[in-house]
Structures are given as C-alpha cells and as structure tokens.
From Swiss-Prot:
InterPro entries: AAA+_ATPase (IPR003593), ABC_transporter-like_ATP-bd (IPR003439), ABC_transporter-like_CS (IPR017871), ABC_transpr_MalK-like (IPR015855), ABC_transpr_MalK/UgpC-like (IPR047641), Mo/tungstate-bd_C_term_dom (IPR008995), NA-bd_OB-fold (IPR012340), P-loop_NTPase (IPR027417)
Keywords linked to the UniProt accession: ATP-binding, Cell inner membrane, Cell membrane, Membrane, Nucleotide-binding, Plasmid, Sugar transport, Translocase, Transport
Boundaries of every ABC transporter domain copy: 4-234
Quaternary data: The complex is composed of two ATP-binding proteins (UgpC), two transmembrane proteins (UgpA and UgpE) and a solute-binding protein (UgpB).
Protein name stated in the entry: sn-glycerol-3-phosphate import ATP-binding protein UgpC 3
One of the GO BP terms on file: carbohydrate transport
SUPFAM superfamilies reported for this sequence: MOP-like, P-loop containing nucleoside triphosphate hydrolases
Listed EC numbers: 7.6.2.10
UniProt main location, coarse: membrane
Membrane disposition: Peripheral membrane protein
Length: 348
C-alpha cells in the first residue's frame, strides 16, 4: 500500500493542453474516483500515473518516490482496463500466473497468490476455462484477479465496467468496493458515470476541461457543489439551474435574500415540491410538460411561469398530472444553491 501524490502535473499534445496543472494527494488505502465527461483529462491523468503517457510538467510520487522516469513495470502498480486485456489462448489460471512467471516469482508463491485471488473473487471453478467460456462479469473478475496477484502498492482502474450491461455493472460495482475495502489497497478509479463514482468513492475528483473542479466525499460534493459545472454533472436527474430573474418574478420571492453576486440558483429535483411545505418556500406558477414514471417515484418536467425555463421535480408515486396542466410548484428556500454565472462558482 502507498500514498500517491500528483504535483502540478500537466500534459500537452503539441500546443493543445489536455491536463492543465493537477494537484492531488491520495491517502494510503483510499479509493479516489476521477469523474467527468469525455475529454476532461481523467484517463490521460491516470495514464500518466501509470507511466503509459509522459508528463509534460510536474511529477508523480508513489510511496514517496518520484516515478516520472520509471517504467510502468517499475512503479509497483496494477491496472484494470475496460477491455479486460486477457490472453485468449490461456486459461484463467494461465492469465493469473503470466505476469508472476515473467517476474521470476517462485512456483509456491505463484500458487499461493492465485489461490488467494481465486478465493477472494470466487473464480476457483473457472481456473481451467478459457476467456471465451466466461461471461463479461467473469472476465472482469479475472482481470481484477490478475491485478490482485501482483500485490501492488496501488490499483488503477480505467473505466473497467463500461463494457457490461446495467445489471452487471451494479453487481460489479459492489464487488469492486468490497474488494478494495478488504485489501485496503490505494486505488484510483476513472469513470464518466457519476452514479458509479458516487457509490464507489471515498473521495470524488470532479474534472472538467483538464482541470479539477472539486474534490470531496460524494455526500459533500452532492450537498454543496462548488461550481455550476459540478451542480449540473453530479446528480441524476441533475440539479435544476434557474436564473434569479425567473424566481424573483414570483410574488412570494419579493423578500428572497441571496448572497451578493447571485444570478443563478440551483435546486435539486427533490427541493421542488407540488405541495406547500412547512418551511420557507417560493411559490412558482408552472405548466406540466411531461411525467416520467420510474417505479416508486416519477420525474415531473414543468415550465416555470411565462418563461421558457424548464425544471424537473422528483415526486412520489405516479401522480395524475395532465400535459399542459397549470400547477403550483414550491421551491424550498433552504435548499437553494447560489451561483454566479460569470464566474461559474458559488457565491456563499
């Protein structure tokens, strides 16, 4: 196990900056998730940590050692990829043993590590099968097993669940978290899926345009997004972003007090209600556009007042709202997130 320090790391492709100066410390045994949209620099950053990309500026330390010039094999890390990267002509056992054999590990030690990984991942009955005989989830377990047998200082996961269907992704997400907690191995995990990030991470690193927008626990990032980007990216459905003029047009908003510089308010779908709450709220005229039943609750899409501003509410059950019906929507004042659209940052 080890700490990982990323110190003012930059990556340029010619004149194009891909990573624009990242500073991050990963504690021993911590699982950090890099999350953001395609092109934000998260996979590039991971590949620089792994040694698969050169670093333009700055440096990476693993267990206190500057590894900028170290080969990937000499960084004491193990990587799990999206595409499994298994040798098709080898059995599961052969895939698990291959790297250890190449390093000259003794046979008794190889047997011990393979047996331990097989037990942890519950792949013992599959050891003599070829990858083509396995399901996607089983192949990903084998890929993780190949990382485990190395007993590295750190695991690096590069979107390992992207090829799996929705049900299997949920199952493997739980297995990865359970595995990491059992092994207590420092881990960095890359994904574009914010739900995956929220459920796996000790801390999230939200990236955008080659920069870090926010670092924090999943709960802290969700409850207090630092920027308009984070507010719109983290959460499903995402936070509603409403111009202050739309809110102030409501009679009940005349005394609404917000920090100086606020011109945009964020409201989570559960901060908008169709019945008046006991706490302070702003009543808004709304027109129903769409109702999406999603099981035990529904997503209600409405247009506010005479504007073109649409918002999404999370409402219990399957309410009977007709399309184009006029309804009242109540915005909880205590759940408002104040932002400035010029800076993109919070104002409180």
């Amino acid at each position: 196990m080890a700490t990982i320090n990323i110190i003012d790391v930059k990556k340029n492709y010619g004149a194009v900056p891909a990573v624009k100066g990242i500073n991050l410390s990963v504690a021993d045994g911590e699982l950090i998730v890099l999350v953001g949209p395609s092109g934000c620099g998260k996979s590039t950053l991971l590949r620089m940590i792994a040694g698969l990309e050169t670093i333009s500026e700055g440096h990476v330390e693993i267990a206190g050692r500057n590894v900028n010039k170290a080969e990937p094999a000499d960084r004491d890390i193990a990587m799990v990829f999206q595409n499994y990267a298994l040798y098709p002509h080898m059995t599961v056992r052969g895939n698990l043993e291959y790297g250890l054999k190449n390093r000259g590990t003794e046979r008794a030690e190889i047997n011990r590590r393979v047996a331990e990984a097989a037990e942890i991942l519950e792949i013992g009955p599959m050891l003599d099968r070829k990858p083509r005989e396995l399901s996607g989830g089983q192949r990903q377990r084998v890929a993780m097993g190949r990382a485990i047998v190395r007993e590295p200082a750190a695991f690096l996961f590069d979107e390992p669940l992207s090829n799996l269907d929705a049900k299997l992704r949920v199952q493997m997400r739980v297995e990865i978290r359970r595995l990491q907690r059992r092994l207590k191995t420092t881990s960095i995990y890359v994904t574009h899926d914010q739900l995956e990030a929220m459920t796996l991470a000790d801390r999230l690193v939200v990236m955008n345009g080659g920069l870090v927008e926010q670092v924090g626990t999943p709960v802290a990032v969700y409850d207090r997004p630092a920027s308009l980007f984070v507010a719109s990216f983290i959460g499903s459905p995402p936070m509603n972003l409403v111009p202050i003029d739309v809110l102030r047009a409501a009679d009940s908003a005349s005394s609404l007090a917000l920090p100086a510089g606020t011109d945009m308010v964020g409201l989570r779908p559960d901060a908008l209600l169709v019945t008046k709450p006991a706490e302070p709220s702003v009543r808004l005229d709304a027109t129903v556009e769409l109702l999406e039943p999603i099981g035990g609750e529904s997503h209600l899409h409405v247009r506010l007042g005479g504007s073109q501003q649409t918002v999404v509410l999370t409402v219990p059950g399957r309410p009977d709202f007709a399309e184009n019906a006029n309804i009242d929507v109540f915005a909880r004042v205590g759940a408002m997130h104040p932002f400035n659209s010029d800076t993109g940052k919070r104002t409180d």
